[in-house]
A protein has these predicted regions:
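Glycine-rich phosphate-binding loop signature in dinucleotide/nucleotide-binding domains
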Residues: 2, 109-111, 177-182, 241-242
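Short, acidic loop-to-helix structural element flanking the phosphoryl-transfer center
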Residues: 85-115, 119-132, 167
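Substrate-recognition "cap/lid" segment bordering the active-site pocket of phosphatases
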Residues: 121-186, 192-200, 216-218
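Short, glycine/polar-rich helix-capping loops at beta-to-alpha or helix-loop-helix junctions
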Residues: 211-222
């Protein structure tokens, strides 16, 4: 496994179980703020920074030049944040199938782990703390070889909060961890934006996982280097790459 130095994982739907809860949080916020949002549109934007989703939906509904556009976006986003944070503070939360076993295996192979997300920092911190994944991370959310993960990056730490599909979260993780060759990085996530960000960052592989927001058939429509039903299957692929 000498060629792979870092695996970049998405969070909700990839390493953290998501039974469409995030999608439902969007719908509740939309309903409360008079925003029309179809399931197809919302699911298609999973993985993007959450404010961007509301910007897109309000643009579709009234146009970005409407005098109420900015205030409507902010109103919907604030309501969504309250709903989302309450959900992650109060509802059961657990890793996806094979996640912790894969983390242990990567550690045994001296491969670093970074978590990226479409969530903003506050809700990401709630998730990390509840799962105990924040142990060993410093104030910049960078860990050591002994911590469970070595980096946590959100759009909140990126200029203008530009998350996926831009490559910046992956590139920031690489920089913080002292990894300078993108071809030593593998990316995996459960949305089209995860796949796209892996390619935009010029990763060695950009893989998809189908136990999150998108089915295999849905992800297969987008460029990818392989799709897996679980992180356990993904681990088998990584093992085979080392042969």
């Amino acid at each position: 496994m000498s060629t792979i130095k870092l695996v970049v994982f998405d969070m909700a739907g990839t390493t953290v179980k998501d039974e469409c809860e995030v999608e439902q949080c969007f719908f509740h916020a939309a309903e409360k703020t008079g925003l029309q949002a179809s399931s197809e549109k919302v699911v298609a934007m999973m993985g993007l920074p959450k404010r961007v989703v509301f910007q897109t939906l309000w643009n579709d509904q009234i146009g970005s030049d409407h005098p109420d556009y900015l205030s409507n976006v902010e109103s919907s986003f604030i309501v969504f944040k309250n709903i989302l944070e309450n959900h992650y503070r109060t509802q059961p939360l657990e890793p996806t199938e094979g996640c912790l076993e894969l983390f242990d295996w990567l550690k045994s192979q001296d491969i670093k782990i970074a978590l990226t997300t479409g969530f903003y920092r506050e809700v990401t911190d709630i998730i990390l703390e509840r799962l105990g994944w924040n142990q060993g991370l410093n104030s910049d959310y960078i860990g050591s070889e002994n911590s469970l993960i070595q980096a946590s990056i959100t759009p909140s730490e990126i200029y203008k909060e530009e998350g996926r599909p831009a490559p910046y979260m992956i590139q920031k993780a690489m920089y913080k961890l002292g990894i300078f060759d993108s071809k030593s990085v593998v990316c995996i996530g459960d949305t089209p934006s995860d796949l796209a960000t892996g390619y935009n960052a010029n990763c060695l592989y950009s893989f998809g996982i189908t136990n999150g927001t998108h089915t295999e058939a849905q992800l297969a429509e987008y460029p990818n280097d392989g799709l897996f039903g679980s992180l356990r299957e993904f681990q088998e692929k990584l093992v085979s790459l080392g042969n």
